């Protein structure tokens, strides 16, 4: 049996409901359903290979050895493993410098340190791709009071809305920079919004338009969910600073906590001065025996991202065939987030319950809507993951607000996603 035939049998075994809901016979639907999947998966694997080549070259360049897996205690001064990981990570991210730290408790924390490090009273922060992710609203000062937000420190905020089709407003960006605009915030991922995630080419265009107006304006990219989904990272196209989380893409599903900043050396150091203290910056902070997991997670990351992208393609294809709006589209560029507009709270909750039942950890629990720190709306979340809160492993969640969109993230292997989505479709069909 040829490779395509074997792949088709795998798809049919993992997705029997596709046959149930599709009146066409398997052989008749081969060209329209299974062969495109094979071609798309092959393309993802080719991209994984290129990204892994870049990671491997960085490990070789900086001569990573087993002695880098140990760490020091206390202040964390002269942590050879940590400092070498910083150099490897900077090379992988195509940046001048990087700081990878377990002391970053989340991507939001890393982003906050980056923004507070770069901005001063009287400066303006300009979001150029619509509203930011919910958890950044309190960092900026759009919600909450007296917590030490950017606005509390005299930093102003402005945002440019997206176009009606969810794209950056290029004309508005081309004239948006003011003398006080110190930092532009470019959120790469869709977050909890119905828009395509930004491609590297999109980010390059934004940076070009900003720098044409003021070369000194800092272009900061929230890189969460975007690492390794293309063959270039934002610093390669001119981003001054990026930040993200290790329990997302770059941790390879095994980093237990942490985040990173990468970009210009002075901006990275400024961000670490917000993480630790002025005068300490990147020289402090023990890695707490986590170096080996962070090195290994980075090495695994391209493959894990590829598996998540395959799983998200299957989610998009399945629910699009069933008539649900999906973003990104089946054939559109994607990262590790797949949104499906389910249209009712009952379907959103049923979907998340099914994902939880098909999780390896705490499958016996049932997700219920609840408030979560940093979010305005109640959330329902399915996340039976080995690392608490990991979105590199398969998870699904959504705010309990219209139009009741579920956001699926991650997946250590696409076959697990296939099993979980089969259960989710069955749960929705039974309502």
Residue ranges and their predicted role:
Residues 7, 25-38, 55-61, 65-68, ...:
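Conserved PLP-enzyme active-site core in the AAT-like
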Residues 80-98, 110:
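Long amphipathic N-terminal alpha/beta scaffold segment
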């Amino acid at each position: 049996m040829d490779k395509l035939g074997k792949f088709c049998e795998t798809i049919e075994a993992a997705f029997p409901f596709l046959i149930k809901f599709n009146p066409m016979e398997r052989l008749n639907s081969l060209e329209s359903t299974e062969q495109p999947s094979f071609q798309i998966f092959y393309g993802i694997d080719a991209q994984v290979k290129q990204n892994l080549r870049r990671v491997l070259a960085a490990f070789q360049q900086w001569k990573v050895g087993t002695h880098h897996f140990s760490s020091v205690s206390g202040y964390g001064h002269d942590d050879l493993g940590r400092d070498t990981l910083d150099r490897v990570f900077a090379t992988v991210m195509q940046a001048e410098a990087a700081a990878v730290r377990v002391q970053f408790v989340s991507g939001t924390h890393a982003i906050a340190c980056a923004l507070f490090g770069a901005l001063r009273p009287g400066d303006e922060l300009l979001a150029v791709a619509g509203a930011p992710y919910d958890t950044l609203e309190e960092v900026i000062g759009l919600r909450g009071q007296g917590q030490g937000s950017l606005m509390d420190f005299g930093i102003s905020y402005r945002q440019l809305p997206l176009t009606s089709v969810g794209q950056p407003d290029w004309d508005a960006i081309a004239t948006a920079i003011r003398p006080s605009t110190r930092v532009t915030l470019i959120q790469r991922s869709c977050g909890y919004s119905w828009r395509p995630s930004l491609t590297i080419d999109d980010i390059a265009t934004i940076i070009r338009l900003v720098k044409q107006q003021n070369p000194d304006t800092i272009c900061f990219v929230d890189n969460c969910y975007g690492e390794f989904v293309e063959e270039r990272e934002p610093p390669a196209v001119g981003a001054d600073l990026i930040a993200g989380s290790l329990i997302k893409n770059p941790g390879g599903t095994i980093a237990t906590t942490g985040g990173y900043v990468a970009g210009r050396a002075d901006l990275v150091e400024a961000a670490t001065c917000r993480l630790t203290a002025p005068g300490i910056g990147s020289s402090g902070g023990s890695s707490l025996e986590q170096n080996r997991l962070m090195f290994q997670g980075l090495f695994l990351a391209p493959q894990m991202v590829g598996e998540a992208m395959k799983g998200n393609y299957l989610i998009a294809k399945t629910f699009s065939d069933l008539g649900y709006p999906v973003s990104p589209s089946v054939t559109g560029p994607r990262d590790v987030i797949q949104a499906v507009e389910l249209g009712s709270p009952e379907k959103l909750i049923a979907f998340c319950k099914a994902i939880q039942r098909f999780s390896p950890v705490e499958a016996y629990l049932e997700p219920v809507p609840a408030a979560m720190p940093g979010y305005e709306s109640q959330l329902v979340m399915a996340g039976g993951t080995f690392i608490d809160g990991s979105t590199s492993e398969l998870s699904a969640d959504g705010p309990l607000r219209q139009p009741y969109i579920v956001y699926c993230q991650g997946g250590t292997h696409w076959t697990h996603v296939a099993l979980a989505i089969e259960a989710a479709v069955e749960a929705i069909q039974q309502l």
